[in-house]
């Protein structure tokens, strides 16, 4: 019996060693614009946050990016800020380019995230800023993926 058990265990180990993980699609190394100076006297003024994501498609099929959103979470403030640490903003209308990643290839995805800021007139008060963690969410033909940027995005205001 022990010899038979040893043979079975050896066969299972050989099978496990010879099998490979299924091909996947993955996102790595996301970054966002480090800072944006909100124009003095702005009230909910629109601007764009730029991000990049490294994508790797190890599958045999093209992967299409169907939609994207971005979640910005306020992680720290300096001075007087309209929002509190922990407040979240989910941006819709996020644009990703290119919208496809070829089979067995890598691509740098350029992401534009609509945002807005408010600032008093410069010189009328002490400067303030808010730092945001940015998490990007992509729905693709290979499934749904999320990745946090390795840096924060800071909005600077009067």
Residue ranges, per PLM feature:
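Bacterial N-terminal signal peptides that target proteins for export
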Residues: 1-8
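Bacterial signal peptide processing site
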Residues: 19-21
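The feature marks short-to-medium sequence segments in extracytoplasmic or secretory-pathway proteins
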Residues: 56-106
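Short, solvent-exposed, Trp/other aromatic-anchored flexible loops in extracytoplasmic proteins
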Residues: 88-132
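Contiguous beta-strand segments within globular domains
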Residues: 43-54, 64-65, 69, 110
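Surface-exposed edge beta-strand/loop patches
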Residues: 30, 73, 114-158
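Short, solvent-exposed loop/turn segments enriched in Ser/Thr/Gly
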Residues: 31-32, 44-52, 129-132
